[in-house]
Structure formats: structure tokens, C-alpha cells
Amino acid sequence: LLLIFSLTLIFSCDMETIIDLEVPPHKPVLVLNGILDTDTTAAVVISHSVSAFSTGNPSFIQDAEVLLFDDIEENPIDSLKIDMSNLVLVNYVNEYQQESLPMYYYRGITIPTSDKNYRIVVNHPDYSSISASTYIPSSIEINNISIDTITDEELIGVSFNFQDDPFKKDYYRIKMFTSCEKKGGKRSRGDAILLSNEPSFGSINFFELLFTGYTFVGREVVFTDDLFDGQNKNISLDIPVDKYLEPSEYDEKIDEENYFKCDTIILEFSTFSDDTYSYYNSLSDHDEKGELNIFGGEVVPVYSNVNNGLGVFISTNAQEVPIRPRPATK
């Protein structure tokens, strides 16, 4: 046994090969990141790329020309300007420590509308111009919202339905938020945990099914109409809750997953275009299995629709519905 181990070790050492890699120089490009929403003015962040082998970090581009077009007007409908009043911190991990990069929005005065295409063009004298397009679909009406707080005291059951469009591919996202009142009348918002056995939410997570009894557990879900194209679709969700807190504890401790001390739960239901779905779907795959580890693996790229550059320019048509209003705790 010792002889076999020794031979294996010698053989392994003899098979080692050193490869010299010649990495081509990196030419920085503009990076565009932005999400158009029908509830707010257009806003994007412009930065530049760095080499994967560089020790430098991307930085904000302050003197770019950012023009917004729609599918009706030939000329730009808006010119986005830097909003220095609101700092945007972009988090990243550097040698196992989380750090932040300071960025700012280029913001316009146009509020995008649904059922329309938008294109953005970014120009800068030191970089090649970039562009990207996105489509904002029409909103979907939510019907028959039902709340169940009786069947299980540890769960809030939520169900609703909507009519899917039979003439096109549709993409959706569901998120839940808790809205709590703090001292001084200010509001605090947190993400809610969603539990569901809805088949259209994707592949079954057998680990979650074994321990929770649900095929889906998460803070948000992105899905398509593949299993219900053109149908009147019913969605059922459960939200786990904790015990009531004493009123004296209300202002001292706000836990985003303890809903009984909050006065409202908000349902956010969004419709997407295919580019937005591609981004969120690839981002989820990248987070789950895209990083290389000591055993190797295949890097899953994150979707980008920016021509001649990097980043993503996508859109969402979101509606928020308060589904469980109750008096605020005093």
C-alpha cells in the first residue's frame, strides 16, 4: 500500500505542467446599469470596466452625455444629468471583505410609460459610445385577493388571480414587503419570505420540500407563463409570521420577518420584457452555480444587453397592493 501511494505521488508530480499565459491588455469600456420603472423618472449609473486581473476598481464617470429615446420621437426625449444629492453605494467583495464603491445616478425628468420601447445612448470622449434598448410591457390587473390568517396561526395565506395574455410570452415577478411605522411617523420596509408549491415557480428544491413542505422558499420569484399561457391564473402563497411583540418592544426592535408588529403587508407584482427576465434568470444562475471553486466549474455569465459596452439596461412595470392593512402598534 505504501509503494502504491509513493508511485502515485511521484506520477502526480511528474504530470505537473506550468503554462505561461499571455494576457492581452484590457481596453476599458463604458458600463451602463439602470432599470426603467413606470413609477419614477429614468435613472442610470455610468462607470467604466477594469481587467479581471487588475487590482483597480471601476469608478463613476462624471462627464458622460446620456440621451434617452423612445420609439416615437426621432430626437432624444430626455438628457439625463448627474444627481449629486444622492450617493449610490455599490457593494462588492474584496479578499473576503465587503467594500463599497461610490456612484451617482444620471437622472432625467421623463417618467417612462408602459407598452413602449426605450433606447439609451451614452457618449464620452475617452470611450466608445454605447447603447441599449428595453421594452416596458402593459400592466396586469390583479383580481380576487384573498387573505387567510385563520387556517394556520403561524402563516398568512395570500391568493390572487390574473389574466395572462395568450398572444405573447409573458414574464412576471412577485415580491412581498412588510411596512412598519417607527417613532416619528417614519416607515420601515423589509422583505418577506414567500412559501409556495406553485409549479410555474421553477424546478423543485427537494431540500426545501423535505424540511418545509414547500417546493419554493425565497424572498422573490421570477417566472414565465409557460405552464398557463392565456389562462386566468391563480397564485397561492404563504408568509411565515412570528408571535406578537409587546407594544413596548415595537419601537426598539423591528425584525423584517415578524409581521404582526407591522401594520401592512405589500404585494409587489411586476411584468417584465424578455431582456429583464434574461437578466434576473442569469443572475440567479450565477449566484447559485456561477462562481469557480477549488473543484472547478463553469462560470455562468450574467446577461448584458449593452452594445459596445457592459452592464444592463432593463425595465419593469410594477404595481404595489397593500393586502393586509391593520392599525399601527402604539
Give residue spans per PLM region.
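C-terminal motif of bacterial Sec signal peptides marking the signal peptidase cleavage site
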Residues: L9-S12
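A sequence/structural signal for flexible, mid-protein segments enriched
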Residues: D14-K330
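Sec-dependent signal peptide recognition
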Residues: L1-I4
